[in-house]
């Protein structure tokens, strides 16, 4: 980044005199900015030795467009903002390699919140009698009041890969217990 530079010079322009508007002679001098962009090493040396121009005609010839100024400022900002992130030796992925792999659905706990009651264990049932409706809180029929269910992805193990678990002969009994609510999470 030795050859990239952006110089900003501020110069006062002479006051505007006009024959048609006599009030223009009493206006203060306007400040004009001069921005020059140097993208190569040769240009950077020329930019560092350049002096602000005082003649209005010469300044108009050398003033870059607004689009070029904006492109230069954006490029310098992006280069300076992205610099430190490229030099970081340890990223987020290197931290994840040291941790053991866990199930993505339950984060390794083996249990998930019940989707019917939201983990409260209570289920809102509607009791309709003639003109008014009454809500009754009963035990959740999905989790049987516990608020948690066994994770259906890892089957309560907390591991992301349990391919051989369902091939075992006792796996059918395990699944039946899990779906009927007889197997408890964390057991």
Swiss-Prot record:
Major localisation: plastid
Location(s), subcellular: Plastid, Chloroplast thylakoid lumen
Transit peptide boundaries: 1-94
CXXCXGXG motif repeat ranges, renumbered to this chain: 103-110, 114-121, 140-147, 151-158
Zinc finger (CR-type): 90-163
GO molecular function terms attached to this record: protein-disulfide reductase [NAD(P)H] activity; zinc ion binding
GO CC, any one term: thylakoid lumen
UniProt keywords, alphabetically: Chloroplast, Metal-binding, Plastid, Repeat, Thylakoid, Transit peptide, Zinc, Zinc-finger
GO biological process: photosystem I assembly
PANTHER family listed in its UniProt record: PLASTID TRANSCRIPTIONALLY ACTIVE PROTEIN, PROTEIN PHOTOSYSTEM I ASSEMBLY 2, CHLOROPLASTIC
Role description: Nuclear genome-encoded factor required for the accumulation of photosystem I (PSI) during plant development.
Protein name as it appears in the record: Protein PHOTOSYSTEM I ASSEMBLY 2, chloroplastic
Organism: Oryza sativa subsp. japonica (Rice)
Gene encoding the protein: PSA2
